[in-house]
Regions:
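Rossmann-like NAD(P) dinucleotide-binding subdomain of oxidoreductase/dehydrogenase enzymes
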Residues: 125-267, 396
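Long amphipathic alpha-helix in the N-terminal Rossmann-like dinucleotide-binding domain
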Residues: 51, 73-84, 98-123
């Protein structure tokens, strides 16, 4: 398969241009080259997508779990069959290395569809005989039409995280990928458009300031689901609250990656890199606040600098590349601006800290793997989300000081602990105000493990069957077993 010159909207089972014919350019962030044009949806297009989803939902909600499971598994099979193509498109459109898209993004997306197929085949309602007179039946029913908006950092995987529960629950969706990275999702729907019920999933591409706003405020939606910044997530929550509909939100983070002096050094260095260099640091749960025990600090920093200095940055399509391009030059400039902010605050650059322009990377948006040292937890670089390959290193003396600093953050999405003392690891994990804690690893995201945040990092948990509670509504049916009148109004 080759990329199309122009991609339309996918509404009501058909591909079509935006009503006004407007398009946006999709570019390769690694070299600035034009990839394709994508439709820039109008408000009328969004209205059509919602109407199509409503009509589809009214039919799809009556399907059996077996039928929905078969559809989910079929989508997973198609993803696996075309994983090389989809991985290449993802790398070209996003800038992340092909070794990540081929081994993580695409296969994990397929796994997600299969996971929910298995979940719904095993799920059951409940019945409770309250006493000899009453029977209570509890059912879960589809919530309806869901508006879903995902970011540019994991476009394909985030699509799976959002769409698999929609299908599993019996809902319908109006789905908006980021205008920066729509191509992998559009390519997937070129592959599955014929197997989907008409109007079940509608893909609306375009600017977040336009189509994203129209989805956010549309009165025809029964639920909103969003992954992205905390600032926009707050707006989504307010919009949902005004209409008294639920919203699930997976938002920003400034996660702590903790290294005790008894940590295995090789394991710790691996976890450090997984935490802040994976996907060029453009990960909501990136281990960007690096807490190192004082007695381990010098040894750890010396080894970390050597590791960061040898990271292969370059062409995302080269299988040997370990770190690719940031999403665009604006993002790269923002990351480097934070490095300057850190320096002004008193931090020192131990390694990196500049744009990477060697080996033909001057046309892209590459940033060197970076560590800032001599950082204190009150600095902006320790409190604000940089969203790039920049780790800030903070010393700690003991557990009490550590936990106080770790929890001194508006966020609570992820965190990591590296130690050979499992009792200490569990004790610290229980003390951390965060939704996910990795022990002696980082950034593992398997289906079946709930992912989501405390505090300003969001509402709800994804990648686990618990999310189906957010995509369904509970119905209780109460049955009288006596066959007699109550006598409450006897004359």
């Amino acid at each position: 398969m080759k990329l199309l010159e122009k991609y339309g909207l996918f509404i009501n089972g058909e591909w079509r241009d935006a009503k006004d014919g407007a398009t946006l350019d999709a570019k390769n962030p690694a070299n600035g080259e034009h990839l394709a044009k994508i439709a820039d949806a109008t408000e009328e297009d969004v209205n059509d997508a919602v109407s199509a989803a409503r009509e589809a939902f009214n039919k799809f909600k009556h399907t059996t779990v077996s039928e929905r499971a078969k559809l989910l598994n079929k989508i997973a099979d198609i993803i696996d069959e075309h994983k090389e193509h989809l991985a290449k498109v993802e790398s070209m459109d996003n800038g992340k290395p092909i070794r990540e898209t081929l081994n993580v993004d695409i296969p994990f997306a397929a796994e997600h569809f299969r996971y929910f197929a298995g979940v719904i085949m095993g799920e059951e309602g409940s019945a409770n005989v309250l006493d000899e007179k009453q029977l209570s039946i509890v059912l879960r029913e589809p919530i309806g039409v869901v508006g879903q908006i995902v970011p540019w950092n994991f476009p394909f995987l985030m699509a799976a995280w959002k769409l698999a529960p929609v299908i599993a629950a019996g809902d319908a969706s109006v789905f908006k990928p980021s205008s920066e990275t729509s191509l992998s999702v559009l390519e997937l729907f070129r592959l599955i458009d014929k197997i989907l019920p008409k109007g079940l999933i509608n893909i609306v591409t375009g600017r977040g300031s336009k189509s994203g706003e129209w989805i956010k405020n549309h009165p025809g939606l029964d639920k909103l689901a969003f992954t992205g910044s905390t600032e926009i997530g707050r707006d989504i929550a307010i919009a949902a609250a005004r209409r008294i509909i639920p919203a699930t939100l997976e938002l920003g983070g400034k996660s702590a990656n903790i290294f005790f002096s008894d940590a295995n050094l090789d394991k710790a260095l691996d976890g450090l890199q997984l935490g802040i260099l994976f996907n060029q640091g453009q990960v909501c749960c990136a281990g960007s606040r690096i807490f190192v025990e004082e007695s381990f600090y010098e040894k750890f920093i010396e080894a970390a600098v050597k590791k960061f200095s040898t990271i292969k940055v370059g062409d995302p399509l080269d299988p040997k590349t370990q770190m690719g391009s940031q999403i665009n030059k604006k993002q790269a400039e923002q990351i480097l601006n934070y490095v300057e902010i850190g320096k002004k605050e008193g931090a020192k650059v131990a390694v990196g800290g500049k744009a990477y322009t060697a080996n033909g990377c001057d046309k892209g948006a590459f940033v060197e793997p970076t560590l800032l040292v001599d950082v204190t937890n009150d600095m902006r670089v320790a409190q604000e989300e940089i969203f790039g390959p920049v780790g800030v290193v903070i010393k700690f003396k003991d557990e009490a000081e550590l936990i106080k600093m770790v929890n001194d953050s508006e966020y609570g999405l992820g965190g990591g602990i590296f130690t050979q003392d499992i009792t200490k690891a569990l004790r610290v994990a229980r003390s951390m105000e965060t939704g996910r804690v990795w022990i002696n690893t980082y950034n593992q995201i398997p289906a079946g493990s709930p992912f989501g945040g405390y505090k300003n990092s969001g509402i709800g948990r994804e990648t686990h069957k618990i999310i189906l509670e957010h995509y369904t509504q509970m119905k209780n049916i109460m049955i009288d077993l006596t066959g007699k009148v109550s006598g409450f109004y006897a004359q």
